[in-house]
Design a protein with these regions (language model features):
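Noncatalytic, solvent-exposed loop/strand surfaces
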Residues: 4-156
Length: 156
């Protein structure tokens, strides 16, 4: 299991691989025993990524399946706000930088999405090679390692 993010007093857990599911669990250090009836806020089995991790921006959770189905959920309730398809396959986890979400595909595409309750594609970029590794942020730059290159992406 991968604990990727927390939302207020909850941990968001992605089981990954096999039959992945995403669970929101109330963080309670005093809890003991079986807490499934008292501390599980929501549990989702559809459109959950096997490899990449979800990301929370504001009150929204964003994730993409390995096959490119991008979904936005309300982080508190787990209810879907919207879903859309991005071509390609995805292993790299999304990142949030400069007020936008970045999704890098195994085919070398970078989709830039504006966060919010509606799907809003800001731009689509094609790079020379595909991405398996998750990008990193340093200062105002995004570093993304493809199969053949290391990219530095920054607004100048």
């Amino acid at each position: 299991m991968c604990i990727r993010d927390s939302y207020k007093d909850n941990a968001i857990i992605n089981s990954g691989y096999g039959k992945p599911h995403l669970i929101s669990v109330k963080i309670d250090p005093s809890a003991a025993g079986d807490i499934s009836d008292t501390h599980i806020n929501w549990d989702i089995f559809k459109r959950v990524p096997k490899r990449s991790s979800p990301i929370i921006v504001g009150d929204q959770l964003y994730m993409t399946t390995d096959e490119g189905i991008l979904t936005c959920l309300d982080a508190k309730t787990g209810k879907s706000s919207w879903s859309d398809r991005m071509p390609g396959h995805y292993s790299a986890s999304p990142i949030f930088a400069d007020g936008k979400l970045y999704f890098f595909s195994e085919m070398g595409h970078c989709y830039v999405i504006a966060p919010g309750g509606d799907y809003n594609l800001v731009s689509k970029n094609k790079l020379d090679s595909g991405f398996m590794a998750s990008p990193a942020i340093s200062g105002k730059a995004i570093y993304a390692r493809s199969k053949t290159h290391l990219y530095r992406i920054e607004n100048l």
